[in-house]
């Protein structure tokens, strides 16, 4: 999973 500084790995969503 690749996201920014705020990334919910549990929900697999990008903020």
Swiss-Prot record:
Enzyme class per UniProt: hydrolase
GO annotation, biological process: proteolysis
GO cellular component: extracellular region
Localization (cell): Secreted
GO molecular function: serine-type peptidase activity; toxin activity
Post-translational modification: Glycosylated.
Record-listed E.C. numbers: 3.4.21.-
Keywords: Disulfide bond, Glycoprotein, Hemostasis impairing toxin, Hydrolase, Protease, Secreted, Serine protease, Toxin
Biological role stated in the UniProt entry: Snake venom serine protease that may act in the hemostasis system of the prey.
Stated name of the protein: Snake venom serine protease
């Amino acid at each position: 999973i690749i996201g920014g500084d705020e990334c919910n790995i549990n929900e697999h969503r990008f903020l």
